[in-house]
Amino acid sequence: MTESSSEIQPVPARFFAALIQEAKHTLRFMAQSGCRGFDCSPETLGFLENLGKKPAPPESLNTIRSDLGDCRRCKLCRTRTHLVFGAGNPKAKLLFVGDGPGYDEDRQGQPFVGSAGQMLDRIITAIKLTREDVYLCNVVKCRPPKNRTPESDEIAVCLPFLERQIAVIQPRFICALGGTAAQSLLCLPLHISKLRGRFHDYRGIRLMPTFHPDYLSHHPEKKRETWEDMKMIMREMGHKI
């Protein structure tokens, strides 16, 4: 026997696949026949079923958006123009969450592009960041008619997608803009004035509630309190004030 012929040759992958299939069929037959002394449990059969399968690709913003598709899960789909998923840095340290798209967002399919978006841009600039540094999204992805507050059934449908977005981005901080965003993420039925001014915990992420930019447009006297909230975020992010 030559040296080359004595080397161990790799076993084709199809051999292992066939072996797994044979073991699975044998154990299933034994389980159905009432045989004892062998592990024919559903867990073992399930383990064998998954052997050799490629692991599912990791979750991404693209897969979440694909899962949303042309969403028809709640009544907001009847009046929307565009679904507004979110935009910004997919690895952002700071994520802003609003309640839902407005008129301009619905027309353009992008978050915070109307007058509230201009106000938010000024806030982002004031904390020495840009839109490219942060991620922007909303609790609900479709505009509520006449910009009303999202209803509980609409939030219940959309919230799991927001939670998945947050899990993928893994920000260090979340700024919840307005009562709907803060209450939805924190599960606390308190007014935004009672929630703001301090950090809360959201699954290990520091969450700061503050007033929504649209609210500030109509109540400019609340800008000072909002700035105090943003300064707390700046300090925690290590930015000089």
How would you label these PLM feature ranges?
Residues 1, 6-9:
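Intrinsic-disorder/low-complexity detector
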Residues 2-3, 14, 21, 25-241:
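A polyanion-binding, active-site-adjacent surface
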